[in-house]
């Protein structure tokens, strides 16, 4: 008896086509790691090879437009990581993969982990601009988290000494490469936040390969940077090196030297600002003196215009005209005119202006002297305040204390040594002098007994 519904009957071509479509649509693009064997490159430029492991193998093809982007020549026995599409070669029914990209297995796996972690943290919002903390301006203390023997530390200290020698720097030494490095970097960031000595941190190292920089692609380091209350400047490798730490940090600097430039002030620029302020002060004083002098000249001119001698000269002229007119008067008026002249002469003598002129001249001289004294006193006080400010700045500079022969010694934990009981034999010490640092090992500890005061 025949079944009620006939089963589907495939031709070979349709079967292979159906299987190919299933593989391409269901599997999609995958990452595969394996060992290369049977590698060939015909005249077409395409690559044909087999990927295998200990128990299986699969045929692979990588077309010319894709293999042009590969930066190395595949070798027999080489471990690689490929991104490929699974398909079926219909004419022979051979299952194979079409490779789109290829990387050496080590770097390829690291790159894959990098992309996965980057996508994860970005989805959580750790890269968002709203969480970026502004850098202090100016910074009062800089913390540096890096290897104490690396070139990055030397570059940072060199730039800071050149730009702002008085800026305090605290070093939190840590490994920056190897399995223990991520944990040490995290502890250094947490320690800097606990001690709260700095207002900005530089976290970084010099350049290297992807494996060398991998500590700064560690999720623990990224989350420690994000959680830091102190603003963090990342300075990992060269300008072309980009790590997860760069995305999480509050600011990314292309190199350690550039990070030092960002967090420091240019002392030469500060000096130019002081000089500019001094020039403006001198110009203001010159303007003030010129204005006072002009005002004094105006007052002096007005006083001259109202001088009693001028009034007397005008009256004298009028008197002469009257005398001329009286000389032509009638004889009967001469006596009366003479009497009137005598009366006028007496009144004029009683109103002699000389004492008033003398008092006015004395008052003017006093005003001139007081004005000169006030201007000299103000100029002297301004110069004295400026000199005191410069002297005070030089006196409070930490480098001035070091220049007088003093030094500061810190233990391995970064604490400043005040007593011998803070150290033990064999420990390493760091001594800060005027022109650099000295690292030394404690060989012997000799306490000094305090002298007893004599009782009288």
Curated annotation (Swiss-Prot):
GO cellular component, one term: exodeoxyribonuclease VII complex
A biological process term (GO) from this entry: DNA catabolic process
Keywords (A to Z) from UniProt: Cytoplasm, Exonuclease, Hydrolase, Nuclease
Main subcellular localisation: cytoplasm
InterPro entries assigned: Exonuc_VII_L, Exonuc_VII_lsu_C, OB-fold_nuc-bd_dom
Catalyses which reaction(s): Exonucleolytic cleavage in either 5'- to 3'- or 3'- to 5'-direction to yield nucleoside 5'-phosphates
CDD domains tied to this protein: ExoVII_LU_OBF (cd04489)
NCBIfam families attached to this UniProt entry: xseA
Assembly, per entry: Heterooligomer composed of large and small subunits.
Record function comment: Bidirectionally degrades single-stranded DNA into large acid-insoluble oligonucleotides, which are then degraded further into small acid-soluble oligonucleotides.
Name the record gives this protein: Exodeoxyribonuclease 7 large subunit
